[in-house]
Amino acid sequence: MTLRGLFALAAPQSVGGQAVIEGVMMRAKDKLAIAVRKSDGEIVTEVRPWFSLVVHPWLKKPFLRGFPVLMETMVNGIKALNFSAVQAAEDDEDDTELTSWHLILTMVLALAAALGLFVVLPHFLSVGMEFLGLGGDVDSLSFHIWDGVIKMAVFVGYILAISYIPDIRRVFEYHGAEHKVIWTWEEGKELSPESTRFYSRLHPRCGTAFMLFVLVVSITLFAILVPYLLTFYSPENFIVKHLYIVGMKLFLMIPVSNIAYEMIKFAGKHSKSLFCKIMSWPGMMMQVLTTKEPDDSQIEVAIAALQCAVNAEEC
């Protein structure tokens, strides 16, 4: 799954998107469009306003905007996924979209799962390495090296595991279609399967790259700040100490996401520079796992989503 709406520039021609179930969501400025292929082959489209949390000027400042933009992208993404699930279902008469409370619960569960997998689990596995004599205490470099290695292993392992699920593979194919269509749009070419299929399924502003930046920034920031902050206060009880550190790490994910957002904005804006190409390369390689080659029917859906996003009044 991508968060390109997170990284779209302010220019009118900038677009972003995400793959959904049997479809694609695209964002252009303050509108989003969802296109879904129904079981009978029909492409259903819907245009909606982009829900934004960045309503105050100070939330638009660099190194403050990343976290609220991430949250609003999650809200819009979950809504788009729910719409696509309803439309793609064989029998959608009994299916309804999420209520506000269901949306909040879904977001809380999604955040809890992500933080559990990529913050809490690596921390306590690193504690296990200390018990096995393979690493040091939390204020040592070896602890944070293990923490980083485990985070990366969990991330790659998770992507590899879900890629074997047929429905997820279909989402990855639509992810590839989304990237190809955005490349075609950015190059000013005709939006058709024939002109689009030859473009790369990898894109430097992909949400996969953002997730990788989050991991790298969190590893670096935790290694520096956690030992330093423990000099001010460190609980004596072993369990309380590590629960305190995990809580500290969870709070630090806010500045981590802010920094990662600025990094990917910079990389996207200067994508032709050698430095940014090197910086973006790991994220591009991860997209080999999170995207698959789409067929023409999937490209058609991505084109429909983009056309509705940029010409909302015609859909």
Segments predicted by a language model, with ranges:
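Divalent-cation
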Residues: M1-A85, A89
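Alpha-helical transmembrane segments
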Residues: K241-I264
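Alpha-helical transmembrane segments of polytopic integral membrane proteins
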Residues: G77-A80, S84, F118-P122, S126, ...
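Hydrophobic alpha-helical segments characteristic of transmembrane helices
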Residues: Q87-G133, D139-Y164
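Polar-ligand-bearing catalytic/cofactor-coordination segments
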Residues: R4-G16, V20, V24-M26, D40, ...
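Juxtamembrane "helix exit" motif at the C-terminal ends of alpha-helical transmembrane segments
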Residues: F83-Q87, L111-G136, V214-I245
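Transmembrane alpha-helical segments and their cytosolic interface motifs
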Residues: S100-G116, Y199-I224
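Low-complexity, intrinsically disordered, cysteine-poor segments enriched in small/polar
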Residues: G66-T73, G77-A80, S84, T184, ...
